[in-house]
Amino acid sequence: VDPDVDRLALVSENGEPFGEEYTLVAVSDYVLSKTPGNTVSNLSSTKALKIVTEKRKGIYHPAAVGEVNVVAKMKEITAVIGGEGNGGIIYPELHYGRDALVGIALFLSHLAQFGRPASMLRAQYPNYFISKNKIELTPEINIDAILETLKKKYAKHPINTIDGLK
């Protein structure tokens, strides 16, 4: 956990990171197996949550980056679980805030029910790569033109502009 106990990163039995992106995915999979419903994560999170949610017959909803945005969307759609790809789990059954201790309890419950090592649990989920880089922009760069170029280039793919371009 981090110092204010709102994010959770896990390590498997072989010393490999479970991946903080997949903390929310695994915990959500467990919650959805017990309480069917919808999920929310911010746009800087893996697509794997969408896949797991749809597999469990729920609807995934993206939200702008920031806990306040995720919580607002969760309340709007009455999500059963949500969070951020940084290991922040929000479980409204208890409260609307990121909580690593809740994440630990839910993850360990999932692992106990799964009955196999954490590495095998992680292998159950689709593997996506997400690059989180900060790009320094100067005033003369035309962001709108760049975004339009990217939208055209990737027109065959779903495009989300809630918070930037994904």
Give a label for each model feature.
Residues T35-K166:
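Phosphate-binding and adjacent anionic-ligand microenvironments
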